[in-house]
Swiss-Prot record:
Function text: Modulates postsynaptic dendritic arbor elaboration and synaptic maturation.
Example of a GO biological process term: neuron projection extension
Propeptide intervals in chain numbering: 115-144
Annotated membrane topology: Lipid-anchor; GPI-anchor
Disulfide partners: none
Organism encoding this protein: Xenopus laevis (African clawed frog)
Signal peptide per UniProt: 1-27
Pfam families reported in the protein's UniProt record: NRN1 (PF15056)
Protein name from the UniProt record: Neuritin-B
UniProt-listed InterPro entries: Neuritin_fam
The entry's keywords: Cell membrane, Glycoprotein, GPI-anchor, Lipoprotein, Membrane, Signal
Keyword Nucleotidyltransferase among UniProt keywords: no
Broad class of where this protein is predominantly found: membrane
Family per similarity comment: Belongs to the neuritin family.
Amino acid sequence: MGLKLSGRYIFLVLAVHLAYLLQAVKAAGKCDAVFKGLSDCMLTLGDKVANYPQDLEEKKNLDTICSYWDDFHVCTVTALADCQEGASDIWEKLKRQSKNLNIQGSLFELCPGSTGAPGPRLLFPAFLPLLIVFLSALLNWVLQ
């Protein structure tokens, strides 16, 4: 019997954390639009995961998840494009730190991106929303 968290619960936690992060950024008065853009990226990723088709074969399953992950990264780069206050550097630092955590089954491992490195073909892990919450928490920690 493993821990089962519903998507709604996880995204509620994410929303609360994002609200806190956005409030902290607004108080600092820096790059408000960037954090709205990042939160929109996370919400879009969450919507895609919530509407994820569960009956796909394994390869198509992973390809679908990786396309969501790629879209998320494109969205974040776009959101960061207008901020001149080091947000891009913070995002790259956050991605490097997240990759270095070496969490088995993480999206960095499952979706190696354009490097051409072969990644394991596993079924969609249920921890994707938890990874999103973790990335949000890590971003908050880096910005403090």
